[in-house]
């Protein structure tokens, strides 16, 4: 069954991620576009470095041609933000990226983008699912890829230069050149290996690179930049005396950072740092947006700068929509995805990395020094998180307890409010909070907590875990 989650459709390769299902999904999208009066439109198709991604992109293009659409196929593995940029730049009504982003190597998937290069919202994906439900594999129309290419029914191109030029035009290249920074870079075997390297070397950064070869198994590790997966980058930063360490996830829409002391910088801090820099040092004005599992320190900083912070459900489509509605400066999530006003309407780890490098160059301060400046004014709340793998039956039982019976544990302190709009979030009277919610991309129950002390944040997680018998 094809079911879209918070980050598109993802499934295990050879289980549900099959040629048959890819063709069905694309046929469903084509039928939707036909009903919207878009017959014959150009549609962007891109793919990452995962196993079968290129082949899957070609299967998708074959179906588009079969229904009379004109695929614009990016002819090499590329960052997901490039696909979003292309949809926006070429004014295409839809686009797709074959990727499972930061998921384990056994997964692949498809992200769908709408006009302006936005993540397809729940209304669009529900309509695609409804169209798929009316189809059988025998109903799907297609034209052989090579035949369609020869007849000019498919366009192959690489808009990478346009994308990189748009980022270079948006950052202070001269300041970065003058700073002559040494950067450790870990693309995690993913698609940013050439694009981010080109961007940073154009800015005359001295690069030290690891894990840039094509490996569909991602070195046997999760292609997600976190405190565990970035230990090799931390060692590189210390060994090569780098000013900064940068990593991106498998499809380059998320950013991970190691500071000059070899310490992992949490995505929560990165979001706060970039918002603070853009408002305080660049002089921008406007609110910010975060999801419900992201640090409330962003709220404190926004309030201190005379701005507002908006909370939305998990799923970057909600962040993007609220950013557009409020003309927000930045929007992001605790997993490392962020978007900045004036660029694409979605998360972009490459652009975020460029802004972070500019931040160091312009301020002349390290990441830790700049965050200390923020912490002196707004505090430094502590963070804890944990993931628990779920079976289908276990998930159903927990959903019954959490969202039907509305059960919550006794945390032994005053509760300000409980919100069950997206997961179950308990906010306490002292400003601390804890949330548990089911992942929209993997069979996991995720928990996150924030409090004045690390012990208290971890206690919230333990209380939930014990209450749910995990």
Question: What would you call each of these model-derived segments?
Answer:
Residues 39-108, 198-258:
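N-terminal small/polar loop signature for handling phosphorylated ligands or for N-terminal nucleophile
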């Amino acid at each position: 069954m094809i079911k879209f989650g918070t980050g598109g459709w993802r499934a295990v390769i050879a289980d549900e991620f099959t040629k048959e299902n890819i063709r069905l999904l694309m046929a469903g999208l084509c039928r939707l576009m036909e009903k919207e009066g878009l017959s014959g439109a150009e549609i962007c198709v891109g793919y990452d470095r995962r196993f079968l991604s290129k082949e899957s992109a070609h299967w998708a293009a074959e179906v588009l041609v079969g229904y009379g659409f004109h695929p614009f196929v990016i002819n090499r593995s590329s960052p997901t933000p490039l696909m979003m940029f292309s949809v926006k730049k070429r004014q295409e009504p839809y686009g797709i990226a074959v990727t499972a982003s930061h998921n384990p190597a056994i997964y692949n998937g498809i992200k769908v983008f709408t006009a302006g290069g936005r993540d397809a919202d729940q209304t669009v994906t529900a309509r695609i699912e409804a169209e798929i439900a009316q189809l059988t594999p025998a109903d799907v129309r297609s034209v052989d890829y090579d035949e369609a290419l020869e007849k000019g029914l498919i366009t192959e191109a690489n808009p990478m230069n346009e994308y990189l030029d748009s980022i270079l035009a948006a950052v202070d290249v001269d300041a970065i050149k003058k700073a002559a920074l040494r950067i450790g870079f870990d693309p995690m075997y993913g698609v940013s290996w050439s694009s981010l390297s080109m961007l940073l070397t154009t800015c005359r950064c001295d690069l030290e690179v690891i894990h840039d070869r094509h490996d569909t198994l991602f070195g046997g590790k999760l292609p997600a930049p976190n405190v565990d997966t970035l230990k090799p980058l931390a060692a590189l930063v210390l060994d090569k005396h780098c000013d900064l360490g940068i990593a991106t996830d498998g499809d380059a829409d998320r950013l991970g950072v190691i500071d000059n002391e070899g310490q992992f910088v949490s995505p929560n801090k990165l979001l706060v740092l970039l918002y603070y820099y853009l408002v305080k040092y660049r002089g921008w004005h406007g609110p910010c947006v975060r999801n419900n599992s992201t640090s409330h320190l962003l709220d404190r900083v926004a309030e201190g700068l005379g701005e507002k912070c908006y909370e939305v459900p998990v799923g970057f489509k909600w962040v993007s929509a609220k950013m557009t509605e409020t003309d927000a400066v930045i929007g992001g999530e605790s997993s490392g995805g962020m978007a900045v006003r004036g660029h694409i309407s979605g998360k972009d780890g490459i652009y975020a990395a460029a802004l972070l490098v500019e931040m160091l160059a312009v301020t002349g301060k390290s990441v830790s020094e700049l965050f200390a400046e923020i912490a002196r004014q707004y505090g430094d709340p502590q963070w804890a998180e944990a993931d628990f793998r779920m079976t289908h039956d276990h998930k159903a039982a927990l959903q019954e307890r959490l969202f039907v019976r509305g059960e919550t544990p006794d945390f032994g302190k005053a509760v300000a409010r409980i919100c069950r709009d997206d997961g179950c979030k308990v906010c306490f009277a002292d400003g601390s909070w804890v949330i548990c919610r089911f992942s929209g991309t993997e069979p996991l129950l995720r928990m996150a907590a924030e409090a004045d002390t690390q012990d208290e944040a971890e206690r919230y997680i333990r209380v939930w875990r014990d209450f749910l018998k995990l």
